[in-house]
Amino acid sequence: MTLTERLREKISQAFYNHGLLCASYPIPIILFTGLCILACCYPLLKLPLPGTGPVEFSTPVKGYSPPPADSDHKQGEPSEQPEWYVGAPVAYIQQIFVKSSVSPWHRNLLAVDVFRSPLSRAFQLVEEIRNHVLRDSSGTKSLEEVCLQVTDLLPGLRKLRSLLPEHGCLLLSPGNFWQNDWERFHADPDIIGTIHQHEPKTLQTSATLKDLLFGVPGKYSGVSLYTRKRMVSYTITLVFQRYHAKFLSSLRARLMLLHPSPNCSLRAENLVHVHFKEEIGIAELIPLVTTYIILFAYIYFSTRKIDMVKSKWGLALAAVVTVLSSLLMSVGLCTLFGLTPTLNGGEIFPYLVVVIGLENVLVLTKSVVSTPVDLEVKLRIAQGLSSESWSIMKNAATELGIILIGYFTLVPAIQEFCLFAVVGLVSDFFLQMLFFTTVLSIDIRRMELADLNKRLPPESCLPSAKPVGRPARYERQQAVRPSTPHTITLQPSSFRNLRLPKRLRVIYFLARTRLAQRLIMAGTVVWIGILVYTDPAGLRTYLAAQVTEQSPLGEGSLGPMPVPSGVLPASHPDPAFSIFPPDAPKLPENQTLPGELPEHAGPAEGVHDSRAPEVTWGPEDEELWRKLSFRHWPTLFNYYNITLAKRYISLLPVIPVTLHLNPREALEGRHPQDGRSAWAPQEPLPAGLWESGPKGPGGTQTHGDITLYKVAALGLAAGIVLVLLLLCLYRVLCPRNYGQPGGGPGRRRRGELPCDDYGYAPPETEIVPLVLRGHLMDIECLASDGMLLVSCCLAGQVCVWDAQTGDCLTRIPRPGPRRDSCGGGAFETQENWERLSDGGKASPEEPGDSPPLRRRPRGPPPPSLFGDQPDLTCLIDTNFSVQLPPEPTQPEPRHRVGCGRSRDSGYDFSRLVQRVYQEEGLAAMRMPALRPPSPGPPLPQASQEEGTAPEKGSPPLAWTPSTAGSIWSLELQGNLIVVGRSSGRLEVWDAIEGVLCCSNEEISSGITALVFLDRRIVAARLNGSLDFFSLETHTSLSPLQFRGTPGRGSSPSSSVYSSSNTVTCHRTHTVPCAHQKPITALRAAAGRLVTGSQDHTLRVFRLDDSCCLFTLKGHSGAITAVYIDQTMVLASGGQDGAICLWDVLTGSRVSQTFAHRGDVTSLTCTASCVISSGLDDFISIWDRSTGIKLYSIQQDLGCGASLGVISDNLLVTGGQGCVSFWDLNYGDLLQTVYLGKNSEAQPARQILVLDNAAIVCNFGSELSLVYVPSVLEKLD
């Protein structure tokens, strides 16, 4: 699978899960979306309606005079001047833009020194402006004569009376915070607190007091303790009532003479007249409102032909609300991030939102209504989103790529449009995926099946070849189980390929081709290309300026040589180049330091002499007022009861002022508390970090670009926040059973199968499985190695089956002649124990940790014993050197098959066999014991080894002898079967010959679990102990093909031992107290053995030497299920219903989840999922990495533990006479297979998946062998 296919699959899965979430919890999602819309639209309360923002008009400064009060141009004659440009303006605004910095900077300065000393110079500037007088031939003119005189503030602004001027000239500066008193400023210990004390606590989008007095947005002022640019910017705002050109020119000349800006290239050519419209402009809204009405009508007209939509007008209204909310959210978010959207220069943006939103609505509607109607609503929504997920994400990625390219063209018009567009796309995607999808799910949910049956479908209008009495909609015939719910399936393609109405064809064409979005993207690319080439301040000019600046021939003179990265610049804050060493003494006032720039003097020769000034000016500084809120000037004039509605003001060119402050002035301007405050000295920053930004044309620096980058970063952060919110909502509200439709929680019903990619639901099928019969009682143990299948029932009978053909190869014990007509039979189980006199057949004791298991030589089966005699082989004693006691001290609990009749004549053996006959009388129907011979030990020793109580509840017809005990565990590898019995006896059988290879004569506690891995056998016992055994053969092992039907070309998955070999089993290690209570679970993999016990703990052993590595504690109940694989991932389940994931390498618990309300009965894992089942009849699927529950499947009663994993994507579960196949990735029910009438009433108690794509189902005393290759081929 390629990367694109994997990415497409992941995106499809994400959209599928999202559709399930929206359809499962519609009301909370709609409420959440509504809150998000309101929160994003809150900044719009302070914005004008579209079309009511201020309008600009520029005129040259040279020769300017106020226009006459009456327009002199004729009616209907075209004119360049707008209609509102008549008469004198309300006021003339003159801003003196001040940039100041402390240079050079060294590490001994504090953060407060960045702005305290520069702000102190504002008082001197204000004093210079107030004292300026124009003297010419006509007389003298002072500021008081030409400025706008204001009176009292409005009565509701008492708090601002000490900050804003009254009864005098309207002059604003940062000094107003301290009533223009330098002493008050110098005595203020907290400048930041004074500036922000009148800031609103909530979100404020209109002009604030700080913006009014500073004249620049707060983020550009540099008055902050955490600024990285050590530069302070503010303006001194003068408001004139009359335009006096000579006075303004003299004021500009004086200020530029006192505070020169040598690198300033600001143009002072134009006046900008700003006209403010009425607060409510209905006329401008008519085109946009008309567009949305047309959108509503078109969607309603189009959806009238879609029968799958319940409320046509409701869907159209939801589409309009989605598009309108997307527009409002975009404008609100842009305002929140610092942009001032007026939509004057981009009226096309709302209409683009309409077009894009309409197309997305049509795409989603078409995709959802095209899904099969027999599916549940949430599955239809999920499949509809999943089918369009790739195209949606591909178009969104393309649009974002075009926007990103356009943003980095450095053209302001393109950058503004791109910022609006990216926020608009994110908000539109958010609303489409949450709001409209949820509303669509609610509408489709109202479309009940009863409503569908009330109207005739289109296919009923077709001529029918059958009689008229045929029903209109064909029902799929249910061959069996007529009581089950019917399934409505789609008709064949010949019925479905009807001619659609024209309006639907238009909708489907737009949705299929996405023509509108592609045309918009193409137009955007062309527009960006034209603006990039023609814009004078765009990327082309910027690159040309960079080349010219670095060229030695640029502009006819040698430009500044670029400094390598390893060379320190002049303003580097290294101590060796600092103007003040850390321990430098304070100098007298009449001395200056080398390299310092004295006031009113040129640059001195020294280390800190910088020919490139740090304070730079760029084209964006000419009209900095544009960055202010559009309500900045109306708010200022409203304070004095002056309205700007239907009037205009004139903005004069900015007067630049540059202030260079040396460190000594910053130190002298400190407040005594500054050194003891929390403003700790900041670490020095490289000079490049606090310069204005990248240099633009002419060597200027465009720090406005950095602002745009910040806005883009904020937009990206907003998108990430929205995604995180969606993720949190998904994690919190995601239904745990979203993958299963139906009435019950997470329970699938027949007839509710999801459809495939072609729109068809997979049918329910019924097959005739291979039924494996031969057990008298319920099957308890199953084992397989892929080619052989071994089963054991409660009666102790072991059957070996061919997993390919279902033939019974061997039965252990072998059947013999019937004894009576009751249906039972005595099978020949007596091996040739009498042939022990043939020497060498019984292996002697070998040195080791414990006595070896006795092996049995192979040979033909001997004749059976008399059916009416008990087994007296236990009384045979070959040790003639020891005198037997007259009576055994311990009872001999041996049960064998026999009639128990005694002889009438002959030697009286009653003293020896009386107890055996009495016991045989209690259980006369039991068969002879299957026991290897004992060559030497005396009878008491044999009695002690095999002393176990008989089974109380055994049926009269049983297969396993009571002395050996019932079979508790079973394992298979190759052709060897390892059996663990309740008496503690371990037996190794040949699966093909049906003979006993070897057994353990040391009777101990019952074997509860077995592990047969390679040549090692591990037995877990009831008393909590572990025994490690090793299989050995006297000749080499060779993989052989066991006897079976021809045609199986594959070899067995494990080694098959040759029949000529003699197998012995030695116990290598014993852990006497592995657990304090019985061991209930045992698994081995990757050289590790994991045990689980009723003492609530797990233990990890090394398989080689039985060394205990870890004891894992985390469950509050007995361990019931354990899983471990080759990746060292361990999962455990207990009676507390919890599932724990462990790291076998470290012994640490990775996660814990409470999965079930009862015991965890089985546990398995795939590469990405953990699958568990419990006594609550639920199968839960968990994410393996996060431990989050994906979904659950409710099983039929008694089928909770019947599950199997065929592959990483396919799960099989059992039901009442059926098996179901599920897609693990999506939780989809793929197919349900019924196993015939014989198994209809039987629950599948156990499922075993074989290597040859076969499934073995345990239905009580019968097994069903099922092959489902079609599902496997489809998934693979």
From Swiss-Prot:
Result, substituting residue 454 to R: Loss of ubiquitination
Topology of this chain in the membrane: Multi-pass membrane protein
Compositionally skewed regions (Pro residues) per UniProt: 930-940
Residue intervals of the SSD domain: 284-442
Annotated compartments: Endoplasmic reticulum membrane; Golgi apparatus membrane; Cytoplasmic vesicle, COPII-coated vesicle membrane
UniProt keyword annotations, A-Z: Cholesterol metabolism, Cytoplasmic vesicle, Endoplasmic reticulum, Glycoprotein, Golgi apparatus, Isopeptide bond, Lipid metabolism, Lipid-binding, Membrane, Methylation, Phosphoprotein, Repeat, Steroid metabolism, Sterol metabolism, Transmembrane, Transmembrane helix, Ubl conjugation, WD repeat
Location of region: Loop-7: 535-710
Ranges where the record places region Interaction with SREBF2: 731-1276
Modified residues (Phosphoserine): 821, 837, 843, 850, 905, 934
Region feature Disordered, mapped onto this chain: 60-81, 669-698, 834-903, 927-960
Leader sequence segment: none
Classification via InterPro entries: Beta-prop_SCAP, HMGCR/SNAP/NPC1-like_SSD, SCAP, SCAP_N, SSD, WD40/YVTN_repeat-like_dom_sf, WD40_repeat_CS, WD40_repeat_dom_sf
Free-text function comment from the UniProt entry: Escort protein required for cholesterol as well as lipid homeostasis. Regulates export of the SCAP-SREBP complex from the endoplasmic reticulum to the Golgi upon low cholesterol, thereby regulating the processing of sterol regulatory element-binding proteins (SREBPs) SREBF1/SREBP1 and SREBF2/SREBP2. At high sterol concentrations, formation of a ternary complex with INSIG (INSIG1 or INSIG2) leads to mask the ER export signal in SCAP, promoting retention of the complex in the endoplasmic reticulum.
Similarity remark: Belongs to the WD repeat SCAP family.
Protein name per its UniProtKB record: Sterol regulatory element-binding protein cleavage-activating protein
Organism, as annotated: Mus musculus (Mouse)
Organism phylogeny: Eukaryota, Metazoa, Chordata, Craniata, Vertebrata
